[in-house]
Swiss-Prot record:
Belongs to the LpxC family. Zn(2+) binds at residues 78, 237, 241. The active site is at 264 (proton donor). GO terms for molecular function: metal ion binding; UDP-3-O-acyl-N-acetylglucosamine deacetylase activity. It comes from Paraburkholderia xenovorans (strain LB400). SUPFAM superfamilies: Ribosomal protein S5 domain 2-like (SSF54211). Transmembrane segments: none annotated. Its EC number is 3.5.1.108. Pathway: Glycolipid biosynthesis; lipid IV(A) biosynthesis; lipid IV(A) from (3R)-3-hydroxytetradecanoyl-[acyl-carrier-protein] and UDP-N-acetyl-alpha-D-glucosamine: step 2/6. This is UDP-3-O-acyl-N-acetylglucosamine deacetylase. The gene is lpxC. One of its GO terms (cellular component) is membrane.
Length: 305
């Protein structure tokens, strides 16, 4: 049986919020079978638990934001991406602010944190959402689409008219049957343009942003002295984001995802469209791990090993 997974022990870290610039304490705790990923604002007078779900995403302008009873947790996509890549089904995420810390701007720190805690299989079948009919959302020339596929693959195209991005490639296709999330995707950092960062700071945003947690570009080049971690780091980060955005649906998807210039809003709209049509998906489990898609039939640390 392909089993659900959580972490073995509690782990903690401290970072800063990308937009607030304030210190944030993050604690990951094991959770029982069928709990899902649950975020908890433990800094509030009465802590608020917000289970990750497509319908709980209330703001997607700058990040994916979970909202419930007036409480919010922002910038969840990198941590959710790490959970997807490591096959974590159940987890409590305690946070002392309304933002998940940005860490180094990638999912790498969260992968390290989860692996440090250890991963434990649970005595319950892992549930998948198997897409059975195509679902698509469009917004002008942008689109995001899910098609039936026995596995999980993504094809993402960005369109940033910038010399440094042009040089590294604007499109990427990955099938996790033969690609390692941890090695090939997890370390791709978020990126921004210097003039946009200044504008955002004037609006009280991006106060925690720096070259320690983002790739920063001027009109012509990358400003970070250490350059890129991957030749195609820009499009890989957008794929990393998409993996995290899609994982809020509650279970891993068995599907092929195709997107052009998609972002948090379009990704969430795609999930809502999927869930609105019950004939377009089914929940499946695998009693025989050998019959599960490659990439999920793992025996070791990661889902997309």
């Amino acid at each position: 049986m392909l089993k659900q997974r959580t972490i073995k022990q509690i782990v903690k870290t401290v970072g800063i919020g990308l937009h607030s610039g304030r210190k944030v304490e993050l604690t990951l705790r094991p959770a029982g079978p069928d709990t899902g990923i649950v975020f908890s604002r433990v800094d509030l007078a009465t802590p608020v638990d917000i289970p990750a779900s497509a319908m709980a995403i209330g703001d997607t302008r700058l990040a994916s934001v979970l909202q419930k009873d007036g409480a919010r947790v922002s910038t969840i996509e990198h941590l959710m991406s790490a959970c997807a890549g490591l096959g974590i089904d159940n987890l409590y995420v305690d946070v002392t602010a309304e933002e998940i810390p940005i860490m180094d701007g990638s999912a790498g720190s969260f992968v390290f944190l989860i692996q440090s805690a250890g991963i434990e299989e649970q005595n319950a079948a892992k549930k998948f959402i198997k897409v059975t009919k195509p679902v698509e959302i469009r917004d002008g020339d942008k689109f995001a689409r899910l098609d039936p596929y026995f596995g999980f693959k993504l094809k993402f195209t960005i369109d940033f008219r910038h010399p440094a991005v042009d040089k590294t490639g604007q499109a990427l296709e990955v099938d996790f049957a033969n690609t390692s999330y941890v090695r090939e995707i997890a370390r791709a950092r978020t990126f921004g343009f210097a003039h946009e960062v200044e504008m955002m700071r004037e609006l009280g945003l991006a106060r925690g942003g720096s070259m320690d947690n983002a790739i920063v570009l001027d009109e012509y080049r990358i400003l970070n002295n250490d350059g890129l971690r991957y030749d195609d780091e820009f499009v890989k980060h957008k794929m990393l984001d998409a993996i995290g955005d899609l994982y809020v649906v509650g279970h891993p998807l068995l599907a092929s995802y195709t997107a052009y210039k998609s972002g948090h809003g379009l990704n969430n709209a795609l999930l809502r469209e999927l869930l609105a049509h019950e004939d377009s998906y089914e929940i499946v489990t695998f009693d025989d791990t050998q019959k599960a898609p490659r990439g999920f039939a793992y025996e070791t640390q990661t889902a997309f090993a």
